[in-house]
Amino acid sequence: MSSNFLHMPMTITMSSQNFQHHDHSSYFASITKDIEAHLKQSIIVKPPFTVYEPMYNLAFTTPPTSAPLLCVAACELVGGHRRQAVAAASSLHLMHVASFTHEHLPLTDRSNPNPMIHHAYNPNIELLIPDAIVPFGCELLTRLDNPIEDDHADRVLKVIVEITRAFGSQGIIDGQFHEKVVNRSNGEEENNNADWIDYTCRKKEGKLYACAATCGAILGGANEEEEEKLSKFGLYVGMIQGYSKIGRGKEEERLKRVEELTKLAIKELEHFKGRRVEEISSIILGP
């Protein structure tokens, strides 16, 4: 299994007596293996090689997110089977790849470029290939065929809507805009603005993880209340991820906010007492 494909979530011990956490790395490792296998089976390097070769490489070299793992865990939490969510998890990863690649284009007009990102391809390739990855990610969902479930097509359609909304102008793109453009125009003062940081984390990582949890719930056959609970759980987990990536600002305030979000996330899982909440709750403070 590729070591840089998907990070394993860290496990933590919660103060709440309702949740006792153990090492569930093997659980997430098995999910990672299934997602990776699905991607390798789906993305075949074939003509035109100028499209599929960089698409394949970007899919397996882009710094990963644990959101796809959350998608599968949410599906299993509500009683679904992993096979129902692996394609959606793979699609989420590809959408993340496209978004990440576009966000880190080596543009010369950026005031604060990121020197840590390795660029294997020219900017024109990194600009165009993600535009091919996005529809391909949606195509993975449409290939699913599950005659056992009468409403399977409806579930897939709902998932496609969730994913496109999360990565669109009301979600991650909006967060990227505020992080890059607004930050550049307002200077360092905005970097330490609590409202700005919270908004960015909510729109970027928050929307991604909320989408992942919601998609897993939908495919697993959750009811509306379960979908809402897991969507909120994903939102809080994603925002925690966002705050963990911020290496500047007031450390004490950030830690306080993360603690608040952790409590909110745990509260949403109380609805699922008696189910396999340990696995999904261990993703709260992932990498």
UniProtKB/Swiss-Prot annotation:
A GO cellular component annotation in the UniProt record = chloroplast thylakoid membrane
Under the heading SUPFAM superfamilies, the entry gives: Terpenoid synthases
Kindly state what the record says about how the cofactor is bound.
Binds 2 Mg(2+) ions per subunit.
> Pfam families recorded for this chain?
polyprenyl_synt
| Residues involved in Mg(2+) 1 binding | E103, D109
Which tissues does the record link to its expression?
Mainly expressed in trichomes, and, to a lower extent, in roots, leaves, flowers and stems.
Its membrane topology is listed as: Peripheral membrane protein
Gene Ontology BP annotations: isoprenoid biosynthetic process
Binding partners and assembly:
Part of a heterodimeric geranyl(geranyl)diphosphate synthase.
Protein's UniProt name: Heterodimeric geranylgeranyl pyrophosphate synthase small subunit 2, chloroplastic
The organism named in the record is Cannabis sativa (Hemp)
